[in-house]
Amino acid sequence: MGKMTIQQILMQLAGGMGTSIQIFAVTLIFSLPLGLFVALGRMSKNKLLQAVIKVYISIMRGTPLMLQLLVVYFGPYYIFGMRVGNSYRLWAVFIGFVINYAAYFAEIYRSGIQSMPVGQYEAAKLLGYSKSQTFIKIILPQVIKRILPSVTNEVITLVKDTSLAFTLSVMEMFTTAKALASSQVSMMPFVAAGIFYYVFNLVVAMFLEWLEKKLDYR
């Protein structure tokens, strides 16, 4: 590959940027609600369900995300003999990120739910609310306010973690920058990637800070 202009390099990086944003968005959209269901299962009175979810959370939090991505991608072939193509790489990244972050969000939800005073449940019962109504209308809105700072930390980590998709050769921002830096013998792609991650994190942090302040007024 010949020398590329700065404009050509930036155009290449833009494609990787789009994939990074896609990984970020898909992970959040699915892991946040999944994490809530996992948290509820973790607090279930069903001991078997509790134990299974506890093991799942322990594995997700106790092993590297990079290793989990490799297991999700190569697992179908080594365990079931299923052949997976290149198109599965991005899907494997989605699946790996969602199940990993759902475990972290589950623990955040759990700590928030368990911090709520028992008296609120009793007061809601006296007012004729069912358990599900109490949770959705009274408990959950307060939990979201309490856990938002912890969620913000995880979301900021997620922005940087999207670079781990390089493990499966998915052409996100870091993978693209690495390939361009090697072919062009230049640090510029890495500098551009660094600026992207910083600005992306800054925008996410500012949005979540604004959301936190807005919820505090309610």
Describe the function of each predicted region:
Residues 1-218:
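Transmembrane alpha-helices and adjacent helix-loop boundaries
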